């Protein structure tokens, strides 16, 4: 009997090794075609990468690891693992959301989602976003086809709108505008919207190439992807606040996890609070409330009915920043690049501050987010001074604030060096890795952390310099 099971085990191991050999053979042949290497050399490089950092032959081939120096391969591989972890978290979120909405148990929920994915090819994110758990299964295929068609139409309409805007600005024919946009896309990798907001129609090809774009930002993000242990935390405002509470310096809670009495006591010394959805971004869903002893219970009842999110004491910003733009808390975005496995700069540093910008509220909005009507100006890392005028998402440039009339270029951000030091200290204590955007507010007593963003975009670096026809990719090239 035991001999029978031992024989089955040996056969299973033999079959596994046989499958692995076939997969490696397939990867070797593919890499040979891509590189021109001979069989032995391709096999050797794949084997060495596997022994050094654990890359499978299929992963080596699929992700073209032959393009990267050996010292960089581990970093790239960790990025792949991190992206898989993000996908896993999205899947879990979708399952939990469907269970909550329907009352299904986990097994049935997974079964239903898998069936829909098999029928339609739907992503987990779309399954949750469009509430497919509430739609009869027999209607899923038609509904998702409609969604995809709508997206295709919206993309086409968006591109046509951009072409029309370029025609209006330049006087070109529609055919010429489309041709020039496509040419810029081929030469620089820019997106349609980047052609418009960065005014590529006014830039020669060399400057277009030097503009830091979405594709460049994505490349850095994939190279320095966040370590798995930080992904869950950074994707959830509650966990981020818990891990970095030392730097927040203000009371906060989760709206669905606190009693009325505790809520009232927590914010007893606050005059204003702000609510942010747990998975919100770009200022979406953010609301502010005045709070007092008289209305605290009423505010609690209102906020506790919102989707799960964090509630924080509203930050009273430094008076100089209020004088500049009083409608919102104007935050500093400090972008860092860090890696524990290899230096990110030629002088051996494992963490580097890439750039900083001041996000300025543009009107009456309570948020300063650039995508919510705000403006941005670049900060000199040495002096803390704004070295550009402010620009908004539409490419409008402001030498003075449109509401207060305050001059923007030359404004010195209070406590800027302390804000940079705070980011460095947070890194030293946590060893958080990746390409990150730290949002920091300045109070009368110094910097406080607002939030940390995964994969900061390119626009906060590039937009302030467009009016001067200067591309800023040069300051990020050392990380590419």
Residue ranges and their predicted role:
Residues 223-332, 337:
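Active-site nucleotide/adenylate-binding loops and adjacent lid/helix of ATP-dependent enzymes
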Residues 368-414:
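Internal helical hairpin/lid segments
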Residues 6, 11, 15-26, 48-93, ...:
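Repeat-associated, polar segments at repeat-unit boundaries in modular proteins
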Residues 150-266, 423:
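Conserved N-proximal alpha/beta basic substrate-recognition cap immediately N-terminal to
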Residues 27-30, 41, 45-49, 76, ...:
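Charge-rich, solvent-exposed alpha-helical interaction surfaces
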């Amino acid at each position: 009997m035991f001999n029978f099971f031992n024989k089955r085990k040996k056969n299973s191991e033999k079959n596994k090794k046989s499958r692995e050999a076939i997969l490696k053979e397939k990867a070797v042949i593919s890499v040979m075609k891509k590189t021109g290497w001979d069989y032995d050399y391709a096999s050797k490089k794949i084997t060495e990468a596997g022994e050094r950092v654990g890359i499978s032959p299929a992963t080596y081939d699929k992700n073209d690891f032959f393009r990267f120096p050996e010292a960089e391969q581990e970093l790239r591989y960790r990025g792949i693992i991190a992206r898989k972890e993000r996908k896993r978290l999205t899947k879990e979120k979708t399952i939990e959301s469907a269970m909550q909405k329907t009352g299904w148990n986990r097994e049935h929920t997974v079964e239903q989602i898998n069936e829909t994915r098999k029928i339609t090819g739907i992503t987990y994110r779309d399954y949750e976003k469009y509430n497919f758990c509430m739609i009869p299964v027999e209607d899923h295929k038609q509904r998702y086809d409609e969604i995809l068609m709508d997206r295709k139409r919206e993309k086409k309409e968006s591109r046509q709108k951009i072409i029309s805007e370029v025609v209006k600005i330049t006087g070109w024919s529609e055919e010429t505008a489309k041709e020039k946009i496509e040419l810029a896309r081929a030469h620089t990798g820019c997106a349609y919207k980047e052609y418009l907001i960065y005014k590529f129609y006014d830039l020669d090809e060399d400057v277009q190439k030097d503009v830091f774009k979405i594709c460049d930002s994505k490349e850095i993000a994939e190279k320095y992807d966040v370590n798995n242990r930080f992904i869950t935390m950074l994707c959830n405002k509650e966990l981020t606040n818990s891990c970095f509470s030392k730097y927040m310096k203000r009371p906060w809670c989760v709206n669905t996890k606190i009693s009325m009495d505790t809520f009232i006591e927590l914010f007893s010394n606050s005059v204003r609070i702000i609510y942010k959805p747990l998975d919100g971004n770009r200022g979406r869903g953010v609301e502010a409330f005045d709070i007092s002893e008289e209305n605290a219970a009423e505010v609690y009842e209102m906020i506790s009915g919102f989707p799960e999110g964090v509630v924080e004491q509203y930050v009273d910003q430094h008076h100089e920043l209020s004088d500049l733009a009083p409608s919102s808390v104007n935050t500093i975005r400090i972008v860092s690049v860090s890696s524990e496995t290899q230096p990110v700069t030629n002088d051996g540093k494992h963490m580097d501050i890439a750039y900083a910008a001041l996000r300025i509220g543009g009107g009456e909005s309570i948020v300063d987010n650039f995508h919510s009507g705000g403006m941005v100006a670049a900060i000199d890392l040495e002096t803390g001074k704004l070295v550009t005028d402010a620009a908004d998402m539409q490419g409008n440039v402001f030498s003075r604030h449109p509401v207060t009339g305050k001059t923007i270029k030359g404004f010195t951000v209070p406590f800027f060096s302390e804000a940079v030091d705070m980011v460095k200290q947070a890194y030293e204590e946590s060893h958080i890795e990746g390409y990150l955007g730290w949002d920091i507010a300045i109070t009368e007593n110094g910097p406080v952390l607002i939030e940390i963003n995964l994969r900061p975009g390119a626009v906060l670096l590039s937009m302030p310099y467009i009016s001067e026809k200067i591309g800023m990719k040069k300051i990020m090239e050392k990380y590419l």
